[in-house]
């Protein structure tokens, strides 16, 4: 992104950007269409020890997958995030935001922001209906800590 514009003409740079965009859309569409894969991904996220390297890898994969959704059209993005939310995205984000690793909490925040972009209503519903309101509590604590310490997290201290 930084080096290529300096060496390529505008037309070639535009072509590369289009190829990257179409490839990202293809990756998201392919993974979204693979229901067993997504079910397995969320099952592993629920079953792995949050301190294990495997959990960290799965979280980073899910974060990247969520961030690729920005390249989708709004209707596709809504449908895709609805499916991810149905699989337990917000429950997983709740677990991630309670993690001791700040980089993983940042991943969780990024996933939450990606899920909010097409439609914030599912998150509002989840925050109200979640037993114990854990995610809401994490978000409030994170904002309070961030305000006072300039870096927030949800862990109980």
Regions found by a protein language model. Give the residues of each.
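Intrinsic disorder/low-complexity flexible regions in very large eukaryotic scaffold/regulatory proteins
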Residues: 27-33, 37, 54-58, 104-108, ...
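Hydrophobic residues within the alpha-helices of tandem HEAT/HEAT-like
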Residues: 12-23, 41, 58-70, 93-97, ...
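Amphipathic alpha-helical segments within extended alpha-helical solenoids and repeat-rich scaffolds
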Residues: 1, 31-51, 80-100, 129-149
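Alpha-solenoid ARM/HEAT helical repeat scaffolds used for protein-protein interactions
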Residues: 23-30, 68-81, 92, 118-127, ...
């Amino acid at each position: 992104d930084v080096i290529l514009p300096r060496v390529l003409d505008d037309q070639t740079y535009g072509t590369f950007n289009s190829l990257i965009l179409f490839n990202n859309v293809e990756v998201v569409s392919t993974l979204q269409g693979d229901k067993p894969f997504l079910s397995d991904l969320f099952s592993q996220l629920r079953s792995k020890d949050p301190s294990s390297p495997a959990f960290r890898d799965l979280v980073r994969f899910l974060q990247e997958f969520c961030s690729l959704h920005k390249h989708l059209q709004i209707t596709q993005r809504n449908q895709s995030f609805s499916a991810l939310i149905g699989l337990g995205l917000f429950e997983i984000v709740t677990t991630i935001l309670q993690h001791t690793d700040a980089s993983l909490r940042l991943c969780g925040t990024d996933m939450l922001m990606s899920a909010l972009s097409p439609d914030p209503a599912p998150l509002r519903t989840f925050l109200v209906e979640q037993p114990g309101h854990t995610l809401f509590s994490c978000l409030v604590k994170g904002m309070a800590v961030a305000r006072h310490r300039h870096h927030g997290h949800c862990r109980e201290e």
